[in-house]
């Protein structure tokens, strides 16, 4: 009996074993012959909608179980009070004594033109989701909407998008929006961007330049951190163009027809013997300012009054450093002549004091505020590394200062040659104050890294060279260099607080600017602001010597004849 049971147990085991072998064999052959059938037998993993996605789809998009309708800009959203209450705006409305707390239909009057239906939809939808998609083109609208509903999280996200996308096309709008909605970080970032790029970018893009507000331009002009490329006269020409563009909002400086007319007008003026000292593209603004019959400055006219505070912030004491610059400014007659005469008097007084060795003329014991309010601002761009040497030309109280970039070190040298002793200071030592700032920028011309020195007082002997800064390894080209310098004690400039309405008496007692330095021979004198920095030695310029002429509108040929008549062509 035991043998029978044992035999049956073995037979049953063999049967099941054979079945398992056949099944494995069948499965194996099936996998080889038809993989698709094998796949159908395996379990599939399906990702279900997350709770957030379901809420967004069912409650916001499909508007299920809505308990309140919100109407704005002629569109109605069927929403839910519990989600809207994430906004302090709606929370106060639904939980206070407002009549809307008991209503299921709310109409919101939108007074801000920046708010759109799309931005409202995006902000409402964000209350049902844990994310919001913000495009740089729509960020201001979303910011305006988030500000209306006091949604700080979305405001912060908008600020991040704006800071990352500052460019010549967006900077003005971003700055104005930041001021309007109180986004301090964006306002600071855009202002810093303007300080770096105002003269480098907007001098070549007039249709963008014209949209800079008077308030912003005034703040930039006053800033000691403004990168003035090349000298203060460069900033003056930019302000002249900016003011002209704002006074003529309908004129398109990039219109090809108007540019061609400008060239014809320039040729007629040249043939008539009229010196414009301006590119053909600038002949329109040149004619507008120089052909006025009034003796008073343009700033004294009703049209010029709104711009007075901007030109008061201009360091006009550094506009009289070069004969050609002075002649152009005098002919423009934008700035009151009284300002120019006072500066010339102060320069001459300081030069006499320096020549007689008066120590009270050298800048000393000045606090930072005094230095920053009165210092000269000069700038330069270095596109590539290498040995480079340059000077900013113009009258500098008998000092010929040369900047030298050698490898990773920026030096300054008091250049003195015996053949130039008639025009250079003979004092053994000259004292001055200086601050150096170097910035590395990216493709969007945003500051990547900035290195700034302290304000230091230097005392240089003839031909002495000292280092200004050893560059940090994080500074990579292209580099922007800004020098703040004070060579003499700043004089009192309270006279700039007054813009004389009539300058006839002052003019009759003054020497014409056209006669100042008429016999001077200065081969290094720049013909314009773009030539204010002169390279020395064998080094190659790191930036073009002059930018492309800015296009301008022109008068017709018949009007040109009238212009020549007014100018005694």
Swiss-Prot record:
The answer to whether the entry has keyword Cytoplasm is: yes
Entry keywords, A to Z: Cytoplasm, Developmental protein
Cytoplasm among the record's keywords? yes
Q: Which GO terms describe its cellular component?
A: cell cortex; Cul3-RING ubiquitin ligase complex; nuclear periphery; nuclear pore
InterPro entries in alphabetical order: BTB/POZ_dom (IPR000210), Gcl-like (IPR043380), SKP1/BTB/POZ_sf (IPR011333)
Which residue intervals make up region (Disordered)?
A: 17-43, 517-553
Q: Where in the cell is it found?
A: Cytoplasm
Q: Which SMART domains match?
A: BTB
Instruction: Write down the Gene3D superfamilies for this protein, in alphabetical order.
Output: Potassium Channel Kv1.1, Chain A
- What are the recorded GO MF terms, alphabetically? ubiquitin-like ligase-substrate adaptor activity
Cite the BTB domain residue spans from the record.
Answer: 66-136
- PANTHER family cross-referenced by the UniProt entry: BTB DOMAIN-CONTAINING PROTEIN (PTHR23231:SF17), GERM CELL-LESS PROTEIN (PTHR23231)
Q: What is this protein called?
A: Protein germ cell-less
